[in-house]
Amino acid sequence: GSGRTRQQISLHSNNVMDVQWLTGRSFEHVAHPNQALADALFATCSADATVHLCKLGEPKPIKTFARHTDEVNAIRFDPSQTLLASASDDANVHIWPLNLSGLATSTTSVAPNDTEPLHILRGHTQEVYALAWNNTGPGSSHPDKPRMLATASFDHTARIWNADTGACLHVIQGHEMSVFTLCFSPCARYLATGGIDHRVLITRVSDAHTVYSYTGGGSIMDLAWTQTPRTQLAVAQSDKQLVVLDLSTSLH
């Protein structure tokens, strides 16, 4: 296209903190009976403590999730595109069910208190800043394994949760300051976490054992695994450096 503005809408009463397209993820593609509808859906979250599910072209949200009590920092759809996780300054993570089939014939805005979370994940003691779904469960490359969600918090920990039951599987306690970012490896076996303490920890998902650590020259702002067979992790740092770690021989 021409790069022109397709739509501009006022959805929130405070800063918009994150936005995610339903089908704009790196997981294995999931086909919907109404793919055109799925491609038009996106979610937003805000410092106004709400999460909106929106459809391109609609002037108002088609669904609002309003159970958090403080800023919502991050949102992520699961691999099956049937769940939405939200992380908040209220120290909780909510997992919301998505009934996309019910949206196929209706674009009517739903009342804010219409939907209860499937699970409220409690355990963090400070703000939860980042989320990541593992490549497990329905719609993933490992459908026989339970859905897993990782969360990063200013309480210096990350947690791995069973998203099917809401149970906390592991608490990762190796950081000395706020955990700012995290991501699972494509093979689903490892979780990388990055903190304000300049450290990257790579944890084995099965037992929460730290299998590799790296200390950079600044706070760790973002992490990204390669999607290629060679195991590499890109690390964005606050000291203006980008580091690529070759972990091919470090992870077993």
Predicted features along the sequence, with ranges:
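WD40/WD-repeat beta-propeller blade N-cap
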Residues: S10-V16, A66-V72, D114, L121-V128, ...
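WD40-repeat beta-propellers
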Residues: G1, V51-C54, I75, V93-L98, ...
